[in-house]
Amino acid sequence: MSNAVATPVGPKSSGADARVSVPLLAELLTAEDRRRRVWADLGGAQGGLTANLSGKPGHLLVADLPRALLDGQAQWYLPDSILPGRFWREPVDRFLCWDLLNYMNGNELGALSSCLARHGANDCRVHALIQYSGKQMSEYPARFTLDGDLRLTVDETGPAGRQTPRYSPKALEKAMPDLRVERTLLLNNGMQEFLFGLR
């Protein structure tokens, strides 16, 4: 497992204008790969991701787990409880979790791990952003917008009011036994970028 530091674009900011490079996600999106790929975005729909995947073979599923959390759904953390079974007929090659893992407890992380393993292709990769600094985070998951330069704009959904779990790589592997941490990258906006593979 490798660990490095990436530099944000422009001045530091905790508001809607915070833009940050996400090298591990950029690698997934720019990989020279002519294979048909199925992507599953566990966040809300956003045009930037669709634009970056445009022209590539495959398709994109959007589960919108943040909306399920806001709506109070009991199993909001399970994408196959949000999208009916017909959406999961093909194995998924890439799962995008954004900051959602920060909002799950150990049991929920374990259930998500099983779900991703059940629907993932053999060479599946799972991307996530984990808060590693600060004691408080926004009450609900942030909104992310990916621009043409493969940088993220992070739009917090409200004031900080929730304790930050600050999951370590070892803690995540323990809670998510179906996944293994392959690479991590510290981002200077207080997040750590993670790339997981299936065990």
Where are the predicted features?
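Periplasmic/luminal catalytic loop of GT-C fold multi-pass membrane glycosyltransferases
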Residues: 82-86, 92, 115
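Short, glycine/acidic-rich beta->alpha junctions
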Residues: 44-45, 108
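A short SAM/SAH-binding and catalytic strip from SAM-dependent methyltransferases
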Residues: 90-110
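Conserved residues at beta->alpha junctions
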Residues: 43-44, 100
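Class I (Rossmann-like) S-adenosyl-L-methionine-dependent methyltransferase catalytic domain
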Residues: 1-31, 37-39, 45-86, 125-199
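Generic secondary-structure microfeatures
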Residues: 99, 108, 120, 130-132
